[in-house]
A protein has these predicted regions:
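N-terminal extension/subdomain marker
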Residues: 1-16
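Serine/threonine-rich, low-complexity intrinsically disordered segments
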Residues: 4, 22-24
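Short, well-structured hydrophobic secondary-structure segments
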Residues: 12-15, 24-38
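Short alpha-helix boundary/capping and kink motifs at helix termini
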Residues: 36-94
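Glycine-centered loop/turn positions within well-structured domains
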Residues: 79, 100-101, 110
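A sequence-level detector for short glycine-anchored, His/Arg-bearing signature motifs
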Residues: 90-106
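Short hydrophobic/aromatic-enriched beta-strand-loop microsegments
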Residues: 110-116
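Amphipathic, charge-rich alpha-helical segments that serve as recognition/docking helices
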Residues: 116-122
Length: 122
């Protein structure tokens, strides 16, 4: 799915690692969070019981939600969610959906790494 949205995003594995390492950290406001595609964070923001819904989705994805919640509470260093920002300002979550939605459900504004892309997300 991601390959169809981001065709030829990385030339090879080393290119990908380099882009991730050099990406900047940002804190998104609610409007930006809602505008990210390929994530459930908008649904979490709209949910009356944010935590319950985030846990339900994390379970559906086979994620160890207890470890993520515990890690967020204890301020364990996790890899940040990765977001691609294209030439038009469109945002696409490349990885970290469970961390992002559980963090939002807990009331945290987690930093995300933003990779700028000169092309357009499909």
């Amino acid at each position: 799915y991601t390959k169809s949205k981001l065709p030829n995003f990385w030339k090879d594995r080393d290119d990908g690692r380099s882009m991730i390492k050099t990406a900047s950290y940002e804190f998104f406001d609610e409007k930006e969070l809602r505008s990210i595609s390929n994530t459930d964070v908008g649904e979490i923001l709209d949910s009356e019981n944010k935590m319950e819904r985030a846990i339900e989705l994390a379970k559906d994805y086979g994620k160890n939600y207890k470890r993520i919640i515990d890690g967020i509470k204890k301020k364990v260093e996790f890899p940040p969610p990765l977001v691609v920002k294209d030439s038009k300002g469109k945002l696409y979550l490349l990885g970290g959906n469970s961390r992002l939605m559980l963090g939002v459900a807990m009331g945290y504004n987690l930093p995300v790494k933003v990779i700028s892309w000169s092309k357009k997300i499909q």
